Amino acid sequence: MVVVGLGNPGPRYAFTRHNVGFLFLDFLKNKDWKTEKYFAWNKINLAGNEVALVKPLTYMNLSGLAMPHVLKFFSASLDDIIVVYDDVSLKLGKIRIRKKGSDGGHNGMKSIIQALGTQEIKRIRVGIGDKPEGMDLVNFVLGEFSDEEWIILNKVFEVMKEALEVILVEGIEKAMSIYNSLEVRA
């Protein structure tokens, strides 16, 4: 399995809502990242399986540029990939696991679908909450989580780790049936 977390590189974006994919990977393993030309990577063991963690080093909207390199580097197929990214249409505390689908308006996922030529890409969408009325969407997704939101987000990351283990052991359908209806609260 190769878990690709989406985000923007650099300290300016490190803790923003849009970087929830990177933040989840750091939750799983926050040290000793190695760097290739188009991505940073690491490995962990989940449910007795070696799992690669990947952060594209392009900006979010160009995430797809890294994907052919990721597939080649890890000798992976499309079926091995799971993409993790933020979803402004989901409430903070909720995740959605899917086997395939459209980009849903997410430019990072749009870039990946275009680069790989298919929508048949497994993904975990992470709710980052509704933007406040009157606030610009860009300012919201590039804003940082509050202390209260971090409490929820860390619990969400624990649930996501469990979900990855279920995907590895029992398959994505089982994980979808368990986790898509859950809502994590503080």
Swiss-Prot record:
Enzyme class name: hydrolase
Subcellular location: Cytoplasm
Keywords, alphabetical: Cytoplasm, Hydrolase, RNA-binding, tRNA-binding
GO biological process: protein quality control for misfolded or incompletely synthesized proteins; rescue of stalled ribosome
Active site: H18 (proton acceptor)
EC number, as in UniProt: 3.1.1.29
Catalytic activity: an N-acyl-L-alpha-aminoacyl-tRNA + H2O = an N-acyl-L-amino acid + a tRNA + H(+)
Stored Pfam families: Pept_tRNA_hydro (PF01195)
Site positions (Stabilizes the basic form of H active site to accept a proton): D86
GO CC, alphabetical: cytoplasm
GO terms of molecular function: peptidyl-tRNA hydrolase activity; tRNA binding
Function statement: Hydrolyzes ribosome-free peptidyl-tRNAs (with 1 or more amino acids incorporated), which drop off the ribosome during protein synthesis, or as a result of ribosome stalling.
Name of the molecule in the record: Peptidyl-tRNA hydrolase
Organism field: Thermotoga maritima (strain ATCC 43589 / DSM 3109 / JCM 10099 / NBRC 100826 / MSB8)
Gene encoding the protein: pth
